[in-house]
Amino acid sequence: MRLEDIRPQAGSTRRRRRLGRGVSAGQGASCGKGMRGQKARKGGSTRPGFEGGQTPLYRRLPKLKHFPRYRRRLEYTLVNLRALADLPAGSEVSLESLMERGIVTTNDGPLKILGDGEVSVPLTIRAAAITASAKVKVEAAGGRVEILGS
């Protein structure tokens, strides 16, 4: 076998479109571009955002200075109380302990506890954030909540 003997897999290549080569060729006359108009001419179409010569929206709006271009939202690792219901009494709940137990599989950021579900045993929760409803439910069960970083 030599390099010049190599051929593409059967059916893997498509024939190129031969435009303007007669009506029966399938792409004759107007070459699939319809009838007249700017999009039918050579040189292709207009750029994105072009409004036909009218001042485009991105130039009509004023420049806003002194604003950060991109403000990154803090992403949390979210856990509902429903996932903590089976933990033994007196357990400490933190991102590390939840990952060890397999309740959380990926670290998407600081731990945030959400209030969906019920908890019946006292737990010590160490998290970056907790919703008000979750805090009420944990403290009603005799647990403690410790907010990290404050």
Curated annotation (Swiss-Prot):
Keywords: Ribonucleoprotein, Ribosomal protein, RNA-binding, rRNA-binding. One of its GO terms (molecular function) is structural constituent of ribosome. GO terms for cellular component: cytosolic large ribosomal subunit. It comes from the Bacteria. GO terms for biological process: translation. Residues 23-35 have a biased composition (Gly residues). Residues 1-57 are annotated as: Disordered. The keyword rRNA-binding applies. Binds to the 23S rRNA. Belongs to the universal ribosomal protein uL15 family. Part of the 50S ribosomal subunit. This is Large ribosomal subunit protein uL15. It comes from Synechococcus sp. (strain JA-2-3B'a(2-13)). The gene is rplO.
